[in-house]
Regions:
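Conserved catalytic cores of phosphodiester-cleaving nucleases, focusing on short active-site segments
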Residues: 46-79
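Active-site metal-binding core of divalent-cation-utilizing nuclease and nuclease-like domains
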Residues: 1-7, 20-56
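Structural motif
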Residues: 27, 61-66, 93-96
Length: 118
């Protein structure tokens, strides 16, 4: 999986934040929560999730260019909605060369997310 190349950078980005609990798909961390669509039975999981000391729950996803943009949009909308319910945000971590693609999708589909470069 290409995301494994960027997971350490993403973890160091999260660890700079004032966090209480960090969950990640990386080895040595508890896995983030998996959301399952009732209609399609598709599973959605963030690459990272963290809780701040105020109790807000944030989700982070490593945003890579993908031929299946619709699937990314659905995933990001679900994660954004779930983060908003817990007073948090969706953070899309875009490696160099992927930021413009990510920003275009976020803007075009009106996704409530913050795009960061890692």
């Amino acid at each position: 999986m290409k995301k494994n190349r960027y997971i350490k950078k993403a973890l160091s980005w999260v660890e700079k934040k004032p966090t209480k609990i960090v969950k990640s798909i990386a080895e040595g961390y508890e896995d983030p929560k998996v959301f399952t669509s009732k209609s399609t039975n598709e599973k959605i999981r963030a690459d990272l999730s963290f809780t701040t000391y105020g109790g807000a729950k944030h989700y982070s996803d490593i945003a890579l260019k993908n031929n299946n943009a619709k699937k990314l949009v659905v995933k990001w909308k679900v994660l954004s909605f779930m983060a908003g319910m817990k007073r948090g945000k969706l953070h899309l971590l875009a490696p160099k060369g992927h930021k413009a693609f990510t920003e275009r999708l976020v803007e075009r589909h009106n996704i409530n997310a913050l795009v960061h470069t890692i």
